[in-house]
Amino acid sequence: GQGANTVLAQIAAEALGIGCDLVDVAPPDTAAVPNSGPTVASRTTMVVGKLIESAALGLKKTLTAAGLLGEVYSTRQFRAACRDYVALYGPLRAFSQYHAPPDIRWDDERYRGDAYGAFAWAVYVAQVAVDMVTYETRVEDFVAVQEVGRVVNPVLAAGQIEGGVAQAIGWALYENVVWRDGRMANARMTDYLIPTAVDTPPIHVVFIENGCPHGPFGAKGIGELPMDGPAPAIASAIENALGIAVDRLPILPETLEQALG
């Protein structure tokens, strides 16, 4: 999916001071953990990553307290410290418990309140061209600026933004859901359009890193961020070009034709 296993392995490796290739992320077992609620809020890196950071630091502290690991060490020395600990004391384990940020006020029973410990921010700028014969809109260039805390993996993060922007361009210009008799009438790739590589412009991704105290090494989640801003940016660019405000999505050619009279 979004590369969570890679990011979580990186967080553990950085906290332990070892290479990422030495970290295996075990498959999650929902029977062994409490209910964490619905799949929302782009929170895996921030919440699970913080737990992993805390547990990894605790594991390193255990080795240090046992006199098996110094302040500076190599991968070989870390491996040796782990082996020696197991030989002397048994299994080497570290545990971590999630603590919500103090300003969160959430009622699990009523499902009300503010459940978010941090927000990511973004600015999007779209350059568009409108064909005045066909009224087709094309996005020619796109700039996406994100403030997402510390970026753990720049390649994965940029890919997440680029993919989200491409999806949002489809939402803004192409993806028109037609309902008929309570059913989606255009549920085929022949009549439900999504952008292809030809329709996707160059996407310039810029990250501004402002560390968040509630995330691992200052990281925040970014999963849903690029779906929020591109459509308004595209609509604003069309308004700037044609002098008309469009108030519904997708912005189809017939929508512009009607608006221009």
Regions found by a protein language model. Name each.
Residues 216-235:
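C-terminal structured "cap/appendage" subdomains that terminate the fold
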Residues 19-20, 246:
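Alpha-helix N-cap/start motif
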Residues 25, 142-144, 205, 251:
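Hydrophobic/anchoring residues in structured secondary elements
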Residues 2-15, 28-165, 176-199, 255-261:
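Cofactor-centric catalytic regions
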Residues 21-27, 196-220:
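Generic long, charged, amphipathic alpha-helical segments
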